[in-house]
Amino acid sequence: MSKPAADDGYSAYEDSWRMGLLLVLGLLIFQAGALYGMGRTPICTCGYVKLWHGVVNSSENSQHIADWYTFSHIIHGFLFYALVRFLFPRSPIGLRLAFAVLIEGGWELLENSPFIIDRYRAGTISLDYYGDSIINSVSDTLAMVLGFVMARRLPIWVIVSLAILFELGTGYLIRDNLTLNVIMLLHPFEAIKQWQSGI
C-alpha cells in the first residue's frame, strides 16, 4: 500500500536536505583540503583557536572562528539564497544550498590566492592580511550557510533589516563592511582608505 501523497512530498523534502547536506560536507572537505594544498595553516599560527576575534588591524584577524567579517558572510547567505531561488526555482532546496556553498567555497579559494591577498594588502587597510586560516575559511562558509537558512526561514523584511543592520553596524564599528570591501577590492579609493585607517 503506497504512502499518502503528502507523506511522499515530505519524504522527498527530507531526501533533498540529506543529499544537500552530504554535498555540503563534501564541498567543505574539498575546500579545507584545497586550502591546505595552497599552504594555508589549519589554525592561527599563534597556536590557539578563539571563538571570536574582534581586533581588525591584527595578524590574528581572519585566523579564528568568527570575527567582524563573519557578518558579511551571513549576508552572502542572504544574497545566494535569493540568487539560487531565482536561477533554480524548481530545484530541491538541498541542491540549491549545495550550489550556494560551491559559490562561497570558490570565493574562499580565490580570496586566499596570492593575487587577491596582494590586492587586499595594496588597496585596502588590510596590511597584516596574509590569507585565512583553514578553520576561519571553513567557518566563513558555514556562516554563509547560516545566512542561507535564515533567508529561507525568516520573512524578507527581517532579512533586509538584518542585512542593513550588519552593514551599518560594522561600517560604524570597524569602518568596513561587505559593500566597502567590494568597492575597495574592485576599485580602491584613497579617500576611503584614509578614512578606514583612522580607526
Swiss-Prot record:
Disulfide bridge positions per record: none
Native organism: Mesorhizobium japonicum (strain LMG 29417 / CECT 9101 / MAFF 303099)
Organismal lineage: Bacteria, Pseudomonadati, Pseudomonadota, Alphaproteobacteria, Hyphomicrobiales
Main location: membrane
Subcellular location: Cell membrane
Coiled coil, from the record: none
Transmembrane segments: 19-39, 68-88, 154-174
Stated family: Belongs to the UPF0314 family.
Protein known as: UPF0314 protein mll5005
Topology of the protein relative to the lipid bilayer: Multi-pass membrane protein
A Pfam cross-reference name: DUF2585
Keywords recorded for this protein, A-Z: Cell membrane, Membrane, Transmembrane, Transmembrane helix
GO cellular component assignments: plasma membrane
Superkingdom of this protein's organism: Bacteria
